[in-house]
């Protein structure tokens, strides 16, 4: 498994505002959208392309286009939905699938409540977006689900992560083509599985359903 932790002042600046408990939901959504676009540059470094020739107003020019089958972007609902537009802005021709998961607060394990994905993902590159990698349960389940359907490699974009969750994903995906791109790697998980210092509940803060 490959891990890339962003090292850029603009990303740190936006993450700082995202963490601030006084940041209102509309601003939080805007920051999450901007952050995933910045992180997507690294996440798409190995996106599959093929050479084409186009005609400029002056002469032919050789360039690149995304290969078929097009990449599949998979937000983990509900919080991952807030990151979808930021990635699709860079890859508008990508397809989108949805995976609905909720963390069981007693077991800290994910429960799948919705799925809308192509049945056959053979030869597909998949990009999973989820704001937080905490225990790793949801991400592990999503990655396994995609590989079971034939995906060839999976790249996950998360705004923040805990070391415990990152280690769990690495152990669970050993031997798989998995890349994790992070805005920041935080200190630890607390006793109930929240990232410290973290940013609270990303879904609640994105959609204004609670204050943390």
Curated annotation (Swiss-Prot):
The lineage of its organism: Bacteria, Bacillati, Actinomycetota, Actinomycetes, Micrococcales. The keyword Glycosyltransferase applies. This is Uracil phosphoribosyltransferase. Uracil binds at residues 195, 200-202. It comes from Clavibacter michiganensis subsp. michiganensis (strain NCPPB 382). InterPro entries: PRibTrfase_dom, PRTase-like, Upp_B, UPRTase/APRTase, Ura_phspho_trans. Pathway: Pyrimidine metabolism; UMP biosynthesis via salvage pathway; UMP from uracil: step 1/1. Binds 1 Mg(2+) ion per subunit. The magnesium is bound as Mg-PRPP. The keyword Transferase applies. HAMAP family: Upp_B. PANTHER family: ADENINE PHOSPHORIBOSYLTRANSFERASE, URACIL PHOSPHORIBOSYLTRANSFERASE, CHLOROPLASTIC.
């Amino acid at each position: 498994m490959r891990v890339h932790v962003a090292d850029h002042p603009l990303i740190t600046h936006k993450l700082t505002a995202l963490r601030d408990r006084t940041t209102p939901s509309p601003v939080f959504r805007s920051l999450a959208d901007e952050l995933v676009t910045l992180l997507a540059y690294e996440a798409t470094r190995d996106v599959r392309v093929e050479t084409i020739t186009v005609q400029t107003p002056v002469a032919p020019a050789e360039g690149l286009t995304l290969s078929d089958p097009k990449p599949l972007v998979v937000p983990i609902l509900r919080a991952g939905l807030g990151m979808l537009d930021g990635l699709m802005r860079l890859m508008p021709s990508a397809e989108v699938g949805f995976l609905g998961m909720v963390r069981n607060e007693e077991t800290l394990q994910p429960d799948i409540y919705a799925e809308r994905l192509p049945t056959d993902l053979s030869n597909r590159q998949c990009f999973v977006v989820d704001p937080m990698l905490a225990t790793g349960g949801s991400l592990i389940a999503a990655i396994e689900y995609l590989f079971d359907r034939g995906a060839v490699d999976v790249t996950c974009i998360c705004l923040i992560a805990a070391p415990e969750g990152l280690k769990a994903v690495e152990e669970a995906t050993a031997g798989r083509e998995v890349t994790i791109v992070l805005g920041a790697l935080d200190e630890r998980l607390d006793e109930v599985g929240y990232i410290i210092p973290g940013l609270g509940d990303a879904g609640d803060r994105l959609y204004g359903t609670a204050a943390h």
